[in-house]
Amino acid sequence: MNNFKKVGLSALAGSLAAISANAAEMSVNGATMLTYTSEDNTETTGNPYGMKTNIGFTASGEVNGYTVSYMQTSKDQFAGMTSARMSIDMGDMGTLAFDQGSGSGLGTIDDKTPTAAEEIWDGLDGAGFTADSVGGLVGTAGASGVWNYVNTFEGVTFNGAIRKGSATKNADGASSGAGGSAWDFALTTDGSMIGVDGLAIGAGYGEDSGSTAAGVNEVDSTHMTAFANYSFGPATFGYQKSEINHGKQGTQSEETDAWGIAFNINENLSV
């Protein structure tokens, strides 16, 4: 839902860019969800009920002929910021953005298998897994402190991300500690290029240089993924394969094979 439409801002010099904007439009949106969570017999379930409460802000305006946009989303129960993004739409030259948590590059296709709602791993606690094993597997640049460039060429969308140092949501005037730089990209298109309606395909690759702290010598880790989804009538079928080759000694490479089927029964129900 959208509330408080057209909240006027006289200038966005500090919020959107280092140059002033004449006017912008801001909107507020929110989401809520009631959950019931039951743990297995090795864990304790006290009160199983929870509620998701998020609120977000978006704004856009014209700056020197370009469209400048900003978004920010709060964490659940308003416990700080979960993501923010400032972008400049340059028309045929593409879109350049600074991302702090919304998702860029390879991370935008970390899990493209069909679902009825959230991804199949949503809600898992990750016990017994590494940080990469549960949820979206790939994405070297991460989603915080990332420069993102998006453009479409001959029907193929390029989404690239690059990060200098650690993936940290720095406040204005701050910098992060030691951390490896990273870059990655995703290429996506549909079946129109090969004459197959309903087909969506994509692939991506990235590298992470590891830690740059004194006395630490790590080899680059590589991330890669590829997916294909096919929609026929109300049904969508999909498969995705992802792989991480860790450069750090003593770590194991990780692979994921995922498939999904989603079926739209009607406009109000999907399985």
Label each residue range with its predicted role.
Residues 1-271:
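Outer-membrane beta-barrel proteins
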